[in-house]
Regions:
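Secretory targeting signatures
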Residues: 1-17, 34-37, 45, 262-287
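Local sequence-structure signature of Cys/Sec-based thiol-disulfide redox active-site neighborhoods
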Residues: 4-11, 17-18, 22-76
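Proline-centered helix-kink/hinge sites
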Residues: 53, 110-111
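Short strand-turn-strand beta-turns centered on an Asx-Gly dipeptide
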Residues: 114-118
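Short catalytic/ligand-binding loop motif for oxyanion handling, primarily in non-cytosolic enzymes
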Residues: 121-123
Length: 287
């Protein structure tokens, strides 16, 4: 579990068959139901196949947006990953991945699954009776911030399946913790990509994240919402016509390290005098 971060959002706009560059598509609403589930994988990863099948069985009938990220850095066998995708994964999940993959301690471990951007698990060995039951339990254990009733996320796409303009907004919760920081991103997802050369023989790779795009954000409506608008060029689909767009909102709360030393407990200018006094007392005791 990652205590100081998570993800809201997950609304999807399907661009399949959208060829008119003036097409307008919108989606949005309350974010408390949809859960973002992220997977880290590679086309050569054999044990990833079992974990992904178990995950999809666990999510059957659930309101989940699945984002499957493929390896890119140092990768020669998997064609689907991106630099931006790996950079984001390392920034969000790298330290937790290292802590959960001894003794190799890698920042990008395939397979890994993350629920809500908050609950992380690496590897293919179940902790309980089965991987499916593990994943079902992690999905059900949603973060409290997904219970923020009335917090909505909306976005609109004007364009076709190759380029367009995305505009979006996201409510600021009146009771969000002090110091909470947000990053907003657009994910371009391909529903299914055929790659028979994959070393794990899966051939069809589902929900592939083809691009990760940072969204510029400004506070709007007197500070009541975040929002923005920008022109986007989309990557070409690997095959077919099955791209979709997903907007996610990543929150984090900086961890402030508490200083419990003797010096930190002394106010301001008294600290040096206090340390001097402590030193004098120590000398007196030695005498």
């Amino acid at each position: 579990m990652i205590p100081n971060q998570g993800i809201l959002g997950g609304h999807v706009i399907d661009l399949a068959g959208v060829s008119n560059n003036s097409t307008t598509l919108s989606v949005g609403g309350d974010m408390t139901q949809t859960q973002v589930v992220e997977v880290y994988t590679a086309t050569w990863c054999i044990n990833c196949v079992d974990t992904e099948h178990a995950l999809m069985d666990a999510l059957e009938g659930e309101d989940a947006t699945v984002l499957v990220h493929h390896r890119f850095i140092g990768e020669s066998q998997d064609p689907f990953g991106t630099q931006a995708g790996d950079d984001r994964w390392i920034a969000l999940y790298g330290p937790t991945s290292q802590a959960n993959t001894p003794p190799i301690n890698v920042e990008r471990s395939a397979p890994s699954v993350v629920f809500d951007g908050h609950r992380f698990v690496a590897g293919s060995a179940p902790n309980g009776d089965s991987l499916e039951s593990d994943y079902a339990g992690m999905f059900a254990d949603k973060h409290d911030y997904r219970s923020w009733n009335g917090v909505e996320s909306d976005f609109t796409w004007i364009g076709d399946n190759s380029s367009g303009t995305v505009s979006w907004k996201f409510d600021v919760h009146p009771n969000e913790p002090s110091g909470m920081e947000w990053n907003h991103r657009l994910m371009v997802v391909e529903h299914s990509a055929y790659f028979p050369e994959g070393g794990n023989d899966l051939e069809y790779y589902e929900d592939v994240v083809r691009a990760v795009i940072d969204l510029d954000a400004t506070l709007q409506d007197n500070g009541n919402e975040w929002g923005g608008e920008q022109q986007i060029d989309l990557p070409a689909a690997w095959d077919g016509d099955d791209l979709s767009l997903v907007v996610v909102h990543e929150w984090s709360i900086p961890i402030v390290e508490s200083d419990t030393s003797e010096e930190s407990r002394l106010p301001g200018f008294l600290a040096p005098l206090g340390l001097f006094a402590l030193g004098a007392a120590a000398l007196a005791r030695r005498d």
